[in-house]
């Protein structure tokens, strides 16, 4: 086994089409008329015959290091590399579905005819996703098709269904783009790539997962502009925004943001950090993963392979003389304990907890074994938020609220509301964009005493939302104003159908009945 020469690694172009290179994990070069094939093992008789048919002359086979070969293939066939720019596929008249229908799978991998269409298809899928504001792209192989789905406004929508024979070609191309090991199909892999769309820069986080009919790939699209959002542009109600800003001005304590996955928690934390960031403060983070880079802030990333966890990172950061620390998520007792101690010793700590309500964060910390007197001493503010889809203004239709739903949300019977329909402007979904709804617990002296005296979650809820809006009352306001639909409220609040036949709705923080 020999190393691939540096001049080959740096400058050589493949004489073989990508499909054949990928399928057989080989690479061919023509150096001054002499053909050399690099491979990690001896070639089979069939591959020898195919190569001779394509090249038309004799060639030499060089056995090489697997990692070097993978790097050589990646560097030569990566069409969307760091900071590359999509071009033709970004045009408004580019029809992704029509183009995808023209691509056919070929059995002859040496024909080379598939390379350009596959590249253009992937470029089109990426550019279309960015234009439609998709947060994720799913490539899902099945026995009879390759399904491509976008997650738009939190909901998955299928946009393409391709010939299953194209699956290995598309998946391999995506792995090359992301600089992943194309020969490794048995283990999950993670990668990252940057794309440029006019004046919009997007980071793409790539995750692969082996499955029955090939590797599944999910691309998470991270708009770099989202990291630059101003705290005043978060869409939080003015009372909650004022509470958040006041808490950020404190020199110590814990600020928590809660909500389900995809509810914008990280964006809220990043906006808070940007508001704090100046040369007079040392701000450090430990994240899993780092979603956006923040200027002037020291960011670190969890690495389970090396044992660098949230708890390990937080403990290490406290030895770096920080003023403010951000922990991506408090998941376990150890992290919670260190965060509490840090907040009691002159540090401002920002983090998230996976609960569906603001007061639920207090219960979650108790369940982790944190004593109530420590929670009451350290906790400053809890913001709970979620994102609700906006009705499309171009096609929303008037309707009358269902009696059961009116009762569930404390609204007047026969209230005129709006429902979704679907049109070209909203891609047939009836919704376009999302709006944040939030609730906030400002831990004042009364709440401190309630936490210290171990009052229940329901008792604290009753006090907090006696004169303040909850998430559910905020959702009801959106319904009354025609901003969202009944179906969306039921979905976003995770209400099950059996709630409509239940005589008790105590699991919801509902507003009092209103005569609107």
Which residues make up each language-model segment?
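Alpha-helix initiation and N-capping motif
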Residues: 9, 48, 66, 70, ...
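Positively charged, low-complexity/disordered segments
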Residues: 509-512, 516
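Core recognition of P-loop NTPase motor domains used across DNA-transaction enzymes
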Residues: 19-30, 46, 50, 71-102, ...
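Charged, low-hydrophobicity low-complexity segments
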Residues: 4-5, 10-13, 66-124, 132
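Polyanionic, low-complexity intrinsically disordered segments
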Residues: 1-54, 190-198, 202-209
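Short glycine/Trp-rich loop-beta-loop segment that forms part of the substrate-binding cleft
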Residues: 36-82, 234-248
């Amino acid at each position: 086994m020999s190393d691939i020469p540096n001049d080959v690694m740096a400058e050589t172009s493949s004489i073989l089409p990508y499909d054949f290179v990928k399928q057989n994990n080989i690479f061919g070069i023509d150096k001054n008329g002499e053909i050399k094939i690099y491979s990690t093992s001896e070639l089979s008789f069939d591959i020898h015959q195919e190569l001779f048919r394509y090249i038309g002359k004799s060639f030499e086979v060089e056995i090489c290091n697997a990692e070097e070969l993978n790097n050589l293939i990646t560097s030569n066939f990566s069409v969307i590399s760091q900071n590359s720019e999509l071009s033709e596929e970004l045009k408004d008249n580019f029809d992704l579905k029509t183009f995808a229908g023209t691509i056919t799978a070929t059995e002859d991998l040496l024909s080379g005819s598939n390379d350009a269409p596959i590249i253009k298809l992937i470029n089109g899928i990426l550019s279309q996703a960015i234009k439609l504001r998709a947060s994720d792209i799913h490539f899902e192989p099945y026995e009879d098709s390759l399904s491509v789905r976008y997650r738009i406004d939190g909901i998955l929508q299928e946009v393409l269904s391709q010939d299953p024979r194209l699956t290995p070609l598309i998946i391999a191309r995506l792995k090359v783009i992301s600089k992943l090991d194309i020969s490794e199909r048995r283990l999950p892999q993670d990668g990252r790539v940057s794309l440029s769309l006019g004046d919009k820069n997007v980071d793409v986080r790539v995750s692969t997962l082996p499955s029955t009919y090939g590797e599944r790939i999910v691309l998470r699209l991270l708009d770099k502009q989202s990291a630059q959002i101003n705290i005043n542009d978060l869409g939080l109600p003015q009372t909650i925004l004022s509470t958040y800003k006041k808490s950020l001005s404190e020199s110590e304590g814990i600020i928590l943001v809660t909500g389900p996955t995809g509810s914008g928690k990280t964006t809220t934390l990043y906006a808070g950090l940007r508001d704090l960031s100046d040369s007079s403060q040392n701000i450090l983070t430990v994240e899993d993963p780092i979603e956006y880079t923040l200027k002037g802030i020291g960011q670190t990333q969890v690495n389970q392979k090396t044992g660098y966890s949230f708890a390990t990172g937080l403990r290490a950061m406290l030895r770096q003389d920080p003023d403010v620390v951000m922990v991506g998520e408090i998941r376990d007792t150890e992290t919670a304990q260190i965060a509490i101690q840090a907040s009691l010793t002159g540090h401002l700590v920002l983090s998230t907890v996976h609960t569906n309500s603001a007061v639920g964060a207090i219960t979650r910390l108790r369940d982790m074994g944190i004593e109530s007197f420590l929670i009451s001493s350290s906790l400053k503010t809890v913001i709970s938020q979620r994102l609700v889809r906006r009705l499309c203004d171009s096609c929303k239709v008037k309707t009358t609220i269902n009696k059961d739903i009116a009762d569930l949300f404390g609204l007047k019977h026969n209230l005129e509301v709006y429902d979704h329909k679907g049109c070209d402007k909203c891609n047939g979904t009836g919704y376009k964009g999302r709006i944040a709804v939030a609730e906030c617990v400002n831990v004042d002296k009364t709440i401190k005493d309630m936490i210290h005296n171990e009052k229940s979650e329901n008792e604290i809820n009753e006090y907090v939302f006696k004169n303040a809006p909850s998430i559910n009352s905020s959702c009801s306001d959106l319904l009354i104003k025609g901003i969202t639909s009944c179906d969306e409220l039921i979905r976003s609040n995770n209400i099950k159908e059996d709630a409509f036949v239940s005589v008790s709705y105590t699991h919801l923080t509902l507003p009092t009945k209103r005569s609107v």
